[in-house]
Design a protein with these regions (language model features):
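Phosphate/diphosphate-binding loops
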Residues: 519, 528-529, 535, 574-595, ...
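Catalytic alpha/large subunits of respiratory electron-transfer oxidoreductases
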Residues: 1-555, 671-673, 679, 702
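Aromatic-residue-lined binding/catalytic grooves and analogous aromatic/hydrophobic interfacial grooves
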Residues: 209, 245, 379, 642, ...
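Catalytic or ion-translocation cores adjacent to nucleophile or general acid/base/metal-coordination motifs
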Residues: 191, 206-214, 533-543, 549-583, ...
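Long, low-complexity segments enriched in small/aliphatic residues
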Residues: 619-797
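C-terminal substrate/ligand-recognition segments
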Residues: 488-492, 496-512, 519-522, 532, ...
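Long, contiguous, secondary-structure-rich segments that constitute the structural scaffold
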Residues: 587-639, 726, 730, 734-735, ...
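Acidic, Ser/Thr-rich peripheral helices and adjacent loops at domain boundaries
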Residues: 427-439, 549-563, 865-867, 884-891, ...
């Protein structure tokens, strides 16, 4: 089709949403998929493949990344795979098996073969706290939720444990019962705010980054910090050069310096550091307090290990250092640098930046300094913003200063979804862990059912890729800049390839994608095959080529395994629930069937052998191997667990070091290094990208869109922040609204006094509402959105009788809005409104009002008055089932007005659009480095640069400004006031009568 684009019209690749489906047998569909895999791999391999990809307009860097292998255009995603490790993560095993196909098509040896690209989950959802690897080197720190009860000071920031973690919220409530203090930081008066001792309201867009910097300043200035902890476990005593902004290296200071790390130390023996990695990170320098001399310090020199060496580093020092070559440089402790840096974040400036009262900021600083243990919990309310990296780093800073790390009830955590394949951790003594399942070598699979998982031969032929690049127009972040010309901001370890084949399971991928309508309109027409594997009819199914019906969890015919990020339980189940109601199969059986068909077509037994025990109906052999090879499950036997040897049948405790699970317990109590270059908790990053982008220090930045001020401005006068702006000046950014990618890379530094005088052109054009998109309690992402009672409960407009035929289903999606803001726009409670973001790129690029698809894609929904939200904030719950071409046609033509597609039965939750109508992909440069040193996800080893769900592009749907326009009245047939607002007048927001006001103020309570 690259050679003849007219075929995309002829066969409806450009209009999948108007095509229909045919039923096929499992054998037929397996054959179609297998033959398509072979054809796509062949089509995009070699020089002809490169030529075709070039004709399709892909960036040269992406084409080069294929390495001439068509298999690299094939993308696989196991959606939320921890919810079913064998079946759902099995999609990545399928991706690894593609090396067999590549070796055949390119006629290469196994060692030269390549597999597919593995798409992420955690980062693509925008759920990772992307700054955490910069601080401690781990993908993310999350505790068991029963540790919440041990906290004495609990701070929730952008987190809603009341509504969004209902099974575990009782642990949070126990804090109050046990005498702890609860604080909530959020723009709106949220459910957790109602449980709090005090609530700090802030301007959206992560203005509260400044709060944590101000708190840190107060703790330092007032000497409320834990000095031994700061010296022993943070990078604040290390010396930094003021010329290069790099940490001072021991080899540069001491003549004939011999590296100081012992091979018997934990860096090598426990954490898996290699010689090449050590050579890159080196040793560091402190100034000894007792002698006044400079001393080398290694990443193993933490905690008592440092003290036992007689080292007592200075915190407050600056001066000149003579280098080994005789030259001199100015250097300072990082502590001294932060004293300068934090001058921009006094109480007055911080209160102006975020809108919080100065007294409350000061109170929180005092509480964190004096109440122990203290914990800060962040969530998607933070991680869904562009500068979450900085905010995550900022929340750690006061905890680092006060020693609230590695102890029960203390820490900074970011629970946001059950994502952690790393629970099945690999170590040399245990075996390959998780990779023993997804990355077993397809050229040498173990066919002995009695073989230990430790002995499975592992080789990953795949490479990770962020679906965010697909969201981004199937493009890397490569920008034409005024001063540097065409510049690539996507590191080699992150570089995507063109997408020609998609296979995913357990995810409503298109519905949940940022810029979803842009994908449908502009990106997916170039994809040759989209395979959706799921348990319900979704919009993604409508826009796919093949939909494979998977069995639900209760219908599994074979054993499956799962674990959790928020509790310590391993769970195995299957084969004892309901028989499948329809012609569905377990996920692993679906994958195995296609593999078997590939082998039949290619006359190669290795494809079936790779799934041997699944095809034999014995996937528990793979589960046993997983248990054998993982540090957290080694020595467990499947049959023992199923027999109830460790408790309830099917359950056992994961073998963590502590109960509850306390991240970094070993670091603090056993003096092990953290998983960073310094071995310490890092308040500073000296990687080249961070220095270039102005983020070597933790700093407050405005977003590239969701701000009234200069897009992406760095609020700082620190002379040791020296960003490159690539010729994109403040004047240019304020004169007109520049392209989103240009705003993304604009790095301009100024004081708050200057920044608050600047303007965002989009704000000036009337896009003055921040759009928050939290999750609802009535769906999981988008799953179960079509359930009747979920629809009814999910909004104020639920009605099982659908008296108003405009309801798309038994309910209608709603937007929460401050009553005064709505009334100023002539909008009544219950009215329908259009919600629009920047029309230059949303709901999709090149949208015009006369395009029929624009009508489908423009967001239209109902307003719910909610005074809990400040004036310039609207809130729309995340991921309802979006409007599609078929659902729009249905509600416009059906007598009953339901938005249910005629041929598929797909039930939309909106008449028009989706909350994704107002989102786009923002490709954050700091998420795409090749130089960040951190721990690998699933093994005791280190790496530099990108890894999916670990250090990769985190999508940020909240980075948007919107305009709200009334569409039609909320009353019956679009006339007059919404019936409830009329009949319940006096009880609804903005219409409260005297009785209601008395009730709200507590005046109806009579004390005796």
């Amino acid at each position: 089709m690259s050679d003849d684009p007219s075929l995309r019209d002829k066969y409806k690749f450009n209009s999948r949403g108007t095509d229909t489906f045919l039923r096929a047998t499992w054998d037929e569909v397996n054959g179609y998929i297998a033959r398509a895999m072979i054809a796509i791999c062949q089509t995009y391999t070699g020089s002809d493949g490169r030529r075709r990809l070039g004709k399709d307009g892909y960036q040269p860097e992406m084409i080069t990344e294929t390495r001439g292998a068509g298999v690299r255009t094939m993308k696989f995603r196991g959606g939320m795979g921890l919810l079913g490790v064998i079946g759902k993560y099995g999609t990545y095993r399928m991706s690894n098996m593609m090396a067999l196909l590549d070796a055949r098509v390119r006629s290469v040896a196994p060692q030269e073969a390549l597999g597919g690209r593995n798409w992420s989950n955690y980062t693509w959802h925008g759920d990772q706290a992307p700054g955490q690897p910069f601080v401690h080197g781990l993908q993310c720190a999350d505790c068991d939720f029963n540790d919440l009860r041990n906290t004495k000071l609990h701070v929730q920031v952008g987190k809603n444990l009341v509504e969004n973690k209902m099974p575990d919220s009782h642990w949070f409530i126990e804090i109050m019962e046990r005498g702890g203090k609860v604080v909530t930081i959020s723009p709106e008066y949220s459910p957790p705010a109602t449980k709090s001792d005090y609530w700090i309201s802030v301007r959206p867009g992560l203005s509260d980054t400044a709060i944590f910097l101000a708190i840190s300043k107060l703790i330092m200035d007032r000497r409320w910090y834990d000095e031994p902890f700061v010296k022993q476990f943070t990078d604040l005593p290390l010396l930094v050069r003021t010329d290069t902004l790099k940490r001072l290296q021991a080899q540069d200071v001491f003549p004939n310096y011999a590296p100081g790390l012992a091979r018997s130390g934990p860096s090598y023996t426990i954490q898996g550091l290699t010689d090449d990695q050590y050579k890159r990170i080196g040793d560091f320098v402190v100034r000894d307090r007792a002698t006044g001399e400079f001393k080398p310090i290694t990443r193993d020199d933490v905690g008592k290990v440092m003290a036992d060496k007689g080292l007592d580093p200075e915190l407050e020092w600056k001066g000149t250092v003579r280098l080994a070559d005789g030259s001199q440089v100015e250097a300072m402790t990082l502590w001294e640098m932060y004293k300068i840096h934090l001058q921009d974040y006094d109480l007055d400036a911080t209160a102006e930046i975020c809108g919080a009262p100065k007294a409350m900021i000061e109170q929180l600083a005092q509480d964190i300094a004096t109440i122990k243990p203290a914990a800060i919990h962040v969530g998607e309310g933070i991680n869904h913003w562009f500068h979450a990296t900085l905010h995550n780093r900022a929340t750690y800073l006061p905890l680092m200063l006060t020693g609230n790390i590695g102890k029960p009830g203390a820490g900074c955590y970011a629970w946001a979804g059950n994502y952690k394949a790393a629970l099945f951790q690999s170590a040399p003594w245990s075996g390959p862990g998780f990779k023993g399942w997804v990355a077993e070598d397809p050229f040498m699979p173990s066919l002995d059912p009695a073989a230990s998982g430790k002995d499975v031969r592992v080789r990953a032929y795949t490479k990770d890729e962020e679906p965010a690049y697909w969201d981004h127009g199937d493009q890397a972040l490569i920008v034409d800049t005024p001063s540097r010309g065409r510049k690539n901001f996507t590191g080699a370890t992150h570089m995507p390839t063109p997408t020609k084949f998609l296979w995913f399971t357990n995810v409503n991928l298109i519905n949940n994608a940022k810029w979803a309508y842009g994908l449908i309109k502009n990106v997916n027409p170039k994809i040759d095959l989209i395979i959706n594997q799921d348990v319900e009819m979704t919009a993604t199914a409508e826009y796919s080529d093949i939909t494979l019906p998977a069995s639900t969890w209760m219908e599994f015919e074979h054993l499956e395994v799962t674990a959790s990020c928020s509790n310590p339980f391993l769970q195995i189940w299957g084969g004892q629930g309901l028989k499948p109601l329809y012609d569905t199969r377990d996920d692993a059986m679906i994958l195995a069937g296609v593999a078997q068909k590939l082998g039949e077509i290619l006359q190669d037994q290795r494809y079936a052998d790779y799934w041997k025990f699944a095809l034999e109906g014995r996937p528990q052999i793979y589960i046993q191997r997983l248990l054998d090879a993982s540090t957290t499950t080694s020595a467990y036997k499947v049959e023992d667990i199923m027999a109830g040897k460790y408790g309830e049948p099917g359950t056992a405790l994961m073998l963590f070091r502590t109960y509850p699970r306390i991240p970094f317990w070993e670091q603090i109590h056993e003096n092990l290094p953290f998983f960073t270059d310094t071995g310490r908790l890092n308040a500073y990053t000296d990687i080249p990208e961070a220095i270039e982008y102005g983020e070597n220090f933790i700093v407050h930045r405005e977003g590239p869109e969701a701000t009234p001020y200069l897009p992406n401005v760095i609020v700082s006068t620190n002379p040791y922040i020296r960003p490159e702006n690539y010729g994109i000046t403040p004047a240019m950014l304020q004169q007109q609204l520049l392209d989103a990618d240009v705003r993304t890379i604009a790095n301009n530094k100024m004081s708050w006094a200057e920044a608050k005088q600047t303007k965002n052109p989009l704000w000036e054009q009337g896009f003055r509402f921040y759009a928050l998109t939290p999750k609802t309690r009535h769906r999981a992402h988008s799953q179960w959105s079509a359930e009747i009672w979920h629809n009814i409960w999910d909004s104020n407009f639920g009605d099982p009788y659908r008296k108003d035929k405009r309801l798309p289903a038994s309910g209608d999606h709603q937007m929460h809005m401050n009553p005064a803001a709505a009334q100023d726009l002539g909008i009544q409670d219950g009215d329908y409104v259009y919600v629009d973001a920047n029309p230059a790129d949303r709901p999709y690029l090149h949208a015009t009002s006369d395009d029929p698809f624009f009508k489908v894609a423009r967001l239209k929904l109902r307003v719910k008055y909610n005074p809990a939200y400040p004036y310039q904030i609207i809130m729309i719950k995340h991921s309802p089932f979006m409007a599609t071409e078929k659902s729009v046609k249905a509600h416009e033509t059906r007598p009953d007005g339901r938005a249910v597609s005629e041929d598929t039965g797909y039930q939309a939750n909106l008449r028009y659009g989706s909350h994704q109508s107002i989102t786009r992909d923002w490709s954050m440069p700091m998420h795409q480095t090749d130089t960040l040193f951190h721990k690998k996800k699933v093994e005791m080893a280190f790496m530099f640069g990108g890894e999916a769900d670990n250090h990769a592009v985190n999508t940020v749907p909240k980075e948007t400004l919107v305009r709200v326009v009334k569409a039609e009245d909320g009353g019956p047939e679009g006339k007059g006031l919404w019936e409830v607002a009329k009949t319940e007048r006096g009880r609804t927001p903005a219409s409260e009568d005297d009785f209601m006001k008395k009730y709200l103020s507590g005046g109806l309570i009579i004390s005796t």
